[in-house]
């Protein structure tokens, strides 16, 4: 069987355009009337609290939350965006739509993840810090932490590592987990341990969140929603159990939502993901996002060094000298190895949808 030729850039653009048309057609509410300009009031500022297809919940200047249509000229709107809205002079009670989003202010930061169709998809914006939540159950893994750290470094959003469910930590597991967390502290990442169930460490987390816009990131089952509920009980987010069969958490939060904390600051709770794909990043960028590698990058004997068993590799020499952790070095190679696999999966998906 002959191998399929890679898709051209033109084919990829047409595929994405057709996909966007399908999304707009499927998500458009034919029963929702368009708001006419004559029925709209003056422009005012607002913040996107949550996005639902072609609608968004907007917090207005006076603190009210209203559901608005989104102008078709707006190609990207996510939770955390600062926007210009116009509210309907007379509320359309039957539709539940109270206004329209006219424009989006420039973002000072954004958190993105790769999308099989659209390349890179922004999932939240105007974020001051990322709280990377890991836990004892599902089993603690540094691979997921390192993927989120790469994403944070790539977007230049300061990360904080949170270990949740420490009430489940056994004496047998504790030494290895403590050693792994210390490696992150040694290279400059702040690490905190909490138990959302027992309330341990929550006051420290509240202080970290004060006067900032934060986002919780982490795989399903690590207790992000439970942690949010402990910090803000009135949020009433759904909480899922850990699957008995797989040990993986059930997806609970269904859409990113911005929440106000009584102690000050905002929190964006975003849907959990089982793996944070990074195939949109070139290998050189991934290496730069491992912050302890930076002093050694460019010091290899050969410019095309793969940082494996290549002779004269500065990174490998740093690992051997104890200047770079072997675990982090191995996770770097796991990420690099996954890049081609994920790119191939995207291309296969694209070809299948033709």
From Swiss-Prot:
- Enzyme class of the recorded protein, top EC level: hydrolase
What name does this protein carry? Small ribosomal subunit biogenesis GTPase RsgA
Q: Where is this region: Disordered?
A: 1-46
Task: Please provide, alphabetically and separated by semicolons, the GO molecular function terms listed in this UniProt record.
Answer: GTP binding; GTPase activity; metal ion binding; rRNA binding
What is this enzyme's EC?
3.6.1.-
A GO BP entry: ribosomal small subunit biogenesis
**NCBIfam families named among the record's database cross-references:** PRK12288.1, ribosome small subunit-dependent GTPase A
CP-type G domain segment(s): 108-276
> Matching PANTHER family, A to Z?
SMALL RIBOSOMAL SUBUNIT BIOGENESIS GTPASE RSGA, SMALL RIBOSOMAL SUBUNIT BIOGENESIS GTPASE RSGA 1, MITOCHONDRIAL-RELATED
Stated family: Belongs to the TRAFAC class YlqF/YawG GTPase family. RsgA subfamily.
Q: List where in the cell it is found.
A: Cytoplasm
What is the recorded function of this protein according to its Swiss-Prot or TrEMBL entry?
One of several proteins that assist in the late maturation steps of the functional core of the 30S ribosomal subunit. Helps release RbfA from mature subunits. May play a role in the assembly of ribosomal proteins into the subunit. Circularly permuted GTPase that catalyzes slow GTP hydrolysis, GTPase activity is stimulated by the 30S ribosomal subunit.
* Originating species: Shewanella oneidensis (strain ATCC 700550 / JCM 31522 / CIP 106686 / LMG 19005 / NCIMB 14063 / MR-1)
Assembly and interaction partners? Monomer. Associates with 30S ribosomal subunit, binds 16S rRNA.
**Where do Polar residues bias regions lie?**
33-46
A single cellular component GO annotation: cytoplasm
Which residues of this UniProt protein bind Zn(2+)?
Answer: 300, 305, 307, 313
Source species, domain of life = Bacteria
The primary location reported for this protein is: cytoplasm
Textual note on the cofactor? Binds 1 zinc ion per subunit.
